[in-house]
């Protein structure tokens, strides 16, 4: 099978790139041909044999002259269609697997795939993995960045609310462009050509189903995670938070609770805009951003970890990773988080944003070592899809 993986970035940049690289490797290991289409970039590490890519678009840098065309290019890209057609004609894929494409590549690429199918008579499936809520929310988070409140006003296609709420970077102009992009493609009905939409949680699926164009085409598949070796680890007396220090992650609520629990030792591992609020608190040790073996050691030795998110998280790796390393999770009851925790076996849930409930749950776990030990042992039996198991599932979607 020939699979064309499409993503705006073709270099390591975030979770969606990790996803496409590992999926591509798995497909090749099973004998499939894989090529990639996206933006050209000096760090690009995958591609296609005709060397066809779109020009890079830098929303944070670049010349003022080049930015003048961005409002149009972010809605419709003729260049993306022309360059993609070169790849389609040469590679002749059986599957086009779309990932993040809005704004830089634009949904116009879907129209080109449809046109190519009609003109060549080829049977090529269009699969889309949703890494965020972009297709139902122009700012992709279902969260207003100005109020830091979760928001579902755009669900069902009411995208004017994006502009009303200044939901993209707090800017009326940028939010208007986001609204126009969403309204334009709603009017074109382009997303109806997607054969299957892969959602990384049942929660995300429920939100995506609000769009009638693909409500019958969604399937929930949790993200894959590398299998790790189980190790009996002596626990130390600290509670771990590892992740971004930002408002939507619930860090403000967690810090408030930490101050009210001076006898509980917390370790925070990460960076972010709220880092200054983390520093200077006696029972919080900020060890900064950690990765690899250092992060693994922190996770394994923690009595339990906390995932206090206050936005609609989809399938956070941190929640899976903690349990895979034998550390129970106290997670916020929001988004896809509850789907990943075996409540009463490998962790507990608390009401997202509720400091009092979070405090009670921390006190309960901290004061009951035997319960934490039991939860930790139960983590040995928890399983999430590896890339091999995910491959088997995705082949059923492709076929």
Can you say where each PLM-predicted feature lies in the sequence?
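N-terminal strand-loop element at the rim of the active site
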Residues: 7-13, 25-91, 272
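Donor nucleotide-sugar binding/catalytic pocket of nucleotide-sugar-dependent glycosyltransferases
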Residues: 125, 135, 152-229
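Conserved donor-binding/catalytic core segment of Leloir-type glycosyltransferases
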Residues: 198, 231-249, 255-259, 267
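Nucleotide-activated donor-binding/catalytic signature segment of Leloir-type glycosyltransferases, i.e.
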Residues: 276-297
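Short acidic/histidine- and often glycine-rich active-site loop of Leloir-type glycosyltransferases
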Residues: 277, 320, 334-344, 348-349
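Acidic donor-binding loop of glycosyltransferase active sites
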Residues: 300-314, 327
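Short glycine-rich donor-binding/catalytic loop of glycosyltransferases
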Residues: 310, 327, 331-338, 352-353
């Amino acid at each position: 099978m020939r699979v064309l993986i499409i993503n705006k970035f073709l270099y390591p940049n975030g979770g969606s790139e990790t996803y496409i690289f590992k999926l591509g490797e798995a497909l090749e290991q099973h004998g499939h041909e894989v090529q990639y289409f996206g933006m050209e970039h000096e760090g690009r590490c995958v591609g296609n044999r005709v060397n066809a890519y779109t020009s890079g678009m830098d929303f944070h840098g670049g010349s003022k002259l080049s930015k003048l065309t961005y409002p149009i290019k972010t809605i419709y890209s003729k260049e993306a269609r022309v360059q993609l057609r070169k790849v389609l004609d040469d590679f002749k894929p059986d599957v086009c697997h779309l990932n993040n494409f809005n704004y830089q590549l634009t949904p116009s690429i879907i129209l080109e795939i449809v046109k190519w199918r009609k003109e060549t008579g080829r049977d090529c499936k269009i699969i889309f993995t949703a890494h965020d809520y972009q297709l139902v929310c122009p700012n992709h988070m279902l969260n207003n960045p100005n109020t830091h409140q979760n928001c579902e006003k755009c669900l069902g296609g009411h995208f004017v609310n994006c502009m009303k709420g200044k939901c993209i970077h707090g800017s009326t102009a940028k939010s208007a462009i986001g609204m126009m992009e969403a309204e334009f493609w709603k009017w074109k009905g382009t997303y109806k050509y997607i054969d299957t939409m892969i959602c990384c949680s049942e929660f995300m699926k429920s939100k995506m189903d609000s769009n009638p164009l693909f409500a019958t085409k969604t399937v929930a598949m949790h993200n894959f995670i590398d299998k790790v070796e189980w190790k009996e680890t002596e626990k130390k007396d600290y509670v771990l938070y590892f992740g971004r220090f930002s408002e939507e992650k619930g860090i403000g609520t967690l810090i408030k609770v930490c101050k009210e629990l001076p006898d509980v030792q917390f370790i925070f591992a990460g960076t972010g805009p709220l880092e200054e609020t983390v520093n200077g608190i006696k029972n919080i040790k900020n060890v900064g951003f950690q990765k690899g073996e250092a992060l693994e050691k922190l996770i394994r030795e923690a009595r339990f970890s906390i995932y206090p998110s206050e936005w609609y998280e989809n399938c956070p790796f941190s929640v899976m990773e903690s349990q895979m390393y034998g550390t129970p999770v106290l997670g916020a009851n929001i988004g896809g988080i509850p789907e990943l925790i075996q409540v009463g076996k490998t962790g507990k849930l608390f009401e997202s944003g509720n400091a009092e409930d979070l405090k009670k749950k921390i006190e309960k776990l901290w004061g009951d070592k035997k319960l934490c030990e039991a939860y930790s042992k139960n983590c040995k039996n928890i399983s999430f899809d590896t890339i091999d198991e995910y491959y088997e599932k995705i082949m059923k979607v492709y076929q």
